Amino acid sequence: ITVNTLSLGVDMAMFNNRLDLSFDWYNRRAKDFADFGASVPALLGANPPRRNTAETETKGFELTVGWKDRINDFSYGATFVLSDYIGKVVKYDNPTKLLNNVWYDGMTMGEIWGYETEGLFKDEAEVAATDQSYLYANWYPGDVHYKDLNGDGKINVGNNTVDDPGDRKVIGNNTPRFSFGLTLNAEWRGFDASVFLQGVGKRDYMFSSASNYFWGFAGNQEHSTYYTIHTDRWSEDNPDGYYPRAYFNTTKNQLPQTRYLQNASYMRIKNLQLGYTLPKTITDKIKFQRARLFINVENLATFTSLPDIIDPEIISPDAKIYPLRRTWGVGANITF
C-alpha cells in the first residue's frame, strides 16, 4: 500500500496568548491495496486472485480553538475541537458497479443504499395494488409499503448495480461527520469546576434486522427483546403505530429504508467534575502540602434522537452493545 498525504496547517496565538488556534487540512490518497480482482470465467472453478489496484481519497480537517483568561480571583478557560473527513473510492475493480457490499468507482464511503417508503400498508386494497413479491411472497396491512422509484410497477433491486439499482437509492451515510469536543473549566478561591462535552454533528444509521434492541422482534423468539418503545407498533387498534406489523419469521419490513433510517448525531456530557482545594492555613495544621476534594460524574447526560436503550457513542449494526453507564465518584488529591 502506498499512502501520499498533503497537509496544510496554521497555528497562531493572540491577545497575549489568551486565544490560540490550530487548523489542519489534509488530503490523503491511498493506492495499491487489494481489491477482489478481475472477473474470470466460471469454467476456471476458482475465485480470481486479489490484486493491488484499488485507490481511495480522504479529505478532512481538524480545528482547535482555545481561550483562557483571569479576572481578579476568577480564572477560566475553554477549548473547542472540531474534526471532519469524507472518503471517496477513486478506483476499484468493479466495472459493472455491482452493489453487493463492494466498492465502486466514485463511491462515497459510508453510503447507505435503501428503499424509500410510502409508510405502512393501510388496508388490503393498498396491498393488492402494490407488487412487492420480489422481496417477499405475502404482504398484509401494517407491513412496510416501499416506493416504486423507477415506475415499473414492481419493487425490486433491478440489476443490482449503481446504474440500475431498481427501487433503491442512496438514503444516507453512516460516516460520523463533524465530531466535536468542548472543555470548559473555571476556578475561584479554591473552588474549581470542569466539564467535557463531546459528540457527532451528523450521522445516519440503519439498524440491521438482527438488532433486537431497535426492532424488538429479531427473527426468532429467543433473540427478541421487548421494551416500552416497541409498544408503539402497528395493529388494528393502533394503525398509526411507528413499528410495522410484528413477525418472528421474516425480516421483510426491516430492509434498509427511509422510514427507519435513524439520525445518530448526539451530544454527551462526558465528564463533570467539581472540586475544592483546602486553604493553606488548614493544610499546614494537618501536615499536608496540598489537599483537594472532588466529586466526579461520567456520562452524565446524552442528547440524541435515538431510543434511550441505544448508546450513540458505541453504536453497532445489531445494537446489542450494552450502553455506557453513568458513574459517580468522590475522591481526594493529597500531596504530603
Language model features by range: what are they?
Residues 26-31, 40-42, 199-203, 210-214:
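Active/binding-pocket-proximal capping segment
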Residues 35-39, 155-162, 242-251:
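Active-site-adjacent bridging/hinge elements
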Residues 70-174, 214, 225-226, 231-238:
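Conserved small-residue
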Residues 173-206:
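Glycine-rich, aromatic-lined ligand/substrate-binding cores of catalytic
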Residues 89, 166, 176-189, 270-275:
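Conserved SET/PR-domain catalytic core that frames the SAM/AdoMet-binding pocket
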Residues 200-292:
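Extracytoplasmic gating/loop element in the C-terminal half of outer-membrane beta-barrel translocons
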Residues 1-4, 57-61, 163, 172-180:
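Short, glycine/acidic-rich beta->alpha junctions
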Residues 1-116, 252, 256-336:
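Extracellular/periplasmic, surface-exposed regions of secreted and cell-surface proteins
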